[in-house]
């Protein structure tokens, strides 16, 4: 990046390819296109300066251009070192949008690019964050705490924290007071995924959340669609592109049976694998059993599994002791947000052979090997291209509505985590029905009164479980 070049992409010449795919994606993203139609004239995001940290894919490019069509200024980075689609990043950079994203970033590059989404040419701060996983939010909040004199940078717990803390110190030295000023300018954050939402709720519980947040993940039209149906298509896609393995007849273990785990188990079962599930939650375990999956412990299943996938959002789900028990050439991957579900750090002293980008063969001292996908990071985005456009349209329409809500009605919200109201959730679903040829039945006034709703909805209570 030069002084006159406010972007970092792999190859700007890929922009034409990216634009062609972006044009196709728009036809599969009716929610975002409807948002442009509904809000384009009123420009509700005029004045918004959005720092976006979310996988820089073709689908995200459509989101970015939707935010801009509604009046926002945007700076963008990917929220994962492997998830960028370089042609998508090039297409966005070619329009003059500052984007900092390359497939296969180092951790140093990743945190430098995260810093760059807050560095506006006029020196003024961002006033909105659009986040996926919480890294952009945590970057600002940890930095502000360090500026306040808290000892938060002296004891990194991982290689990633070492790099993060170094980047914070670098910015503090270059721009004293930057983090505090930036934190105080934020009107709100919209958070895409389970992991990031958990971080926000922890901050709220500790009284450390300095601005309102909208939990996009728990919109029904996100968690029950993106997390389930998206994973149902993209997990097997990532494993196939990474390994070309025949999945029919193989034993696959899915660790976790939340929404992502449910979609992942169905994905593997649909490919013909014999699927087993591990769970800590008795309700989810019972669901898995009654959906026809054998519920096991990883300790018991380790030696017979051909494919093992983590979906939990927790740490140390697959330990080095588990991996020592795995079969020769077992495929190991993760579709949760961070790389700590698998103890990848414990493998670093073993023999690694890079087969191709995001596919590594790791050999144990006894000669046994495992295939690790995307170094334990999101394999559906590292080894493939993530979820299809249609399901991401629902998720990203929620993001757009959340950004509008927090930017235009900031004073209506306390420094807490909120979920979009039911009528907006139903609106997002409604916008996607025509594309699938689905037609809604309309309640009569009498029918609506009988169940205590209006013919236009909302049709379910806030606590209804879909």
Swiss-Prot record:
GO terms of molecular function: adenosylhomocysteinase activity
Keywords: Cytoplasm, Hydrolase, NAD, One-carbon metabolism
Source species, domain of life: Bacteria
Reaction catalyzed: S-adenosyl-L-homocysteine + H2O = L-homocysteine + adenosine
Record-listed NAD(+) binding positions: 193-195, 227, 256-261, 279, 314, 335-337, 380
Record-linked SUPFAM superfamilies: Formate/glycerate dehydrogenase catalytic domain-like, NAD(P)-binding Rossmann-fold domains
EC numbers on record: 3.13.2.1
Matching PANTHER family: ADENOSYLHOMOCYSTEINASE (PTHR23420:SF0)
Pathway: Amino-acid biosynthesis; L-homocysteine biosynthesis; L-homocysteine from S-adenosyl-L-homocysteine: step 1/1
Example GO biological process: one-carbon metabolic process
Protein name: Adenosylhomocysteinase
UniProt remark on cofactor binding: Binds 1 NAD(+) per subunit.
Protein family: Belongs to the adenosylhomocysteinase family.
Pfam families, alphabetized: AdoHcyase, AdoHcyase_NAD
Binding locations of substrate: 57, 132, 192, 222, 226
């Amino acid at each position: 990046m030069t002084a006159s070049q406010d972007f970092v992409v792999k190859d700007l010449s890929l922009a034409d390819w990216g634009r062609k795919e972006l044009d196709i994606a728009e036809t599969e993203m009716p929610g975002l296109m409807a948002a442009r139609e509904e809000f384009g004239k009123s420009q509700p995001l005029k004045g918004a300066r959005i720092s976006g940290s979310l996988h820089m894919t073709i689908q995200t490019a459509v989101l970015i251009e939707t935010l801009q069509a509604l009046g926002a200024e945007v700076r963008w980075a990917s929220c994962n070192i492997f998830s960028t689609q370089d042609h998508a990043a090039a297409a966005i950079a070619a329009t003059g949008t500052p984007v900092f994203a390359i497939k296969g970033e180092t951790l140093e590059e990743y945190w430098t690019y995260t810093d760059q989404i807050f560095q506006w040419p006029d020196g003024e701060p961002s006033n909105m964050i659009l986040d996926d996983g919480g890294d952009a939010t945590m970057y600002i909040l940890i930095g502000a705490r360090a500026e306040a004199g808290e000892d938060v940078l002296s004891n990194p717990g991982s290689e990633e924290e070492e790099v993060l803390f170094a980047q914070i110190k670098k910015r503090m030295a270059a721009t004293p007071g930057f983090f505090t000023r930036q934190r105080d300018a934020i009107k709100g954050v919209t958070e895409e995924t389970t992991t990031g939402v958990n971080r926000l709720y922890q901050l709220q519980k500790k009284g450390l959340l300095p601005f309102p947040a909208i939990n996009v993940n728990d919109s029904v039209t996100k968690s029950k669609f993106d997390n389930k149906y998206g994973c149902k298509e993209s997990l097997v896609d990532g494993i196939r592109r990474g390994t070309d393995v025949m999945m029919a007849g193989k034993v696959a273990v899915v660790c976790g049976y939340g929404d992502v785990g449910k979609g992942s188990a169905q994905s593997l079962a649909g490919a013909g694998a014999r699927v087993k599930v591990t769970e800590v939650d008795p309700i989810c375990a019972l669901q898995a059993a009654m959906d026809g999956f054998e519920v096991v412990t990883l300790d018991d299943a380790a030696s017979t599994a051909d494919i093992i996938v983590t979906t939990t959002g927790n740490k140390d789900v697959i330990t080095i002791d588990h991996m020592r028990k795995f079969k020769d050439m077992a495929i190991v991957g993760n579709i949760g947000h961070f790389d700590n579900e698998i103890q990848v750090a414990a493998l670093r002293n073993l023999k690694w052979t890079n087969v191709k980008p995001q596919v590594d063969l790791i050999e144990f001292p006894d000669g046994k090997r495992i295939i690790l996908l995307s170094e334990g990071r999101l394999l559906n985005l590292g080894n493939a291209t993530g979820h299809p456009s249609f399901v991401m349209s629902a998720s990203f329409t929620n993001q757009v509505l959340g950004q509008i809500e927090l930017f235009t009605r900031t004073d209506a919200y306390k420094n807490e985590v909120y979920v979009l109201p039911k009528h907006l959730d139903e609106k997002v679903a409604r916008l996607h029905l025509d594309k699938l040829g689905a037609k809604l039945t309309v309640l009569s006034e009498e029918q609506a009164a009988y169940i205590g709703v209006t013919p236009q909805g909302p049709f379910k209570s806030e606590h209804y479980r879909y």
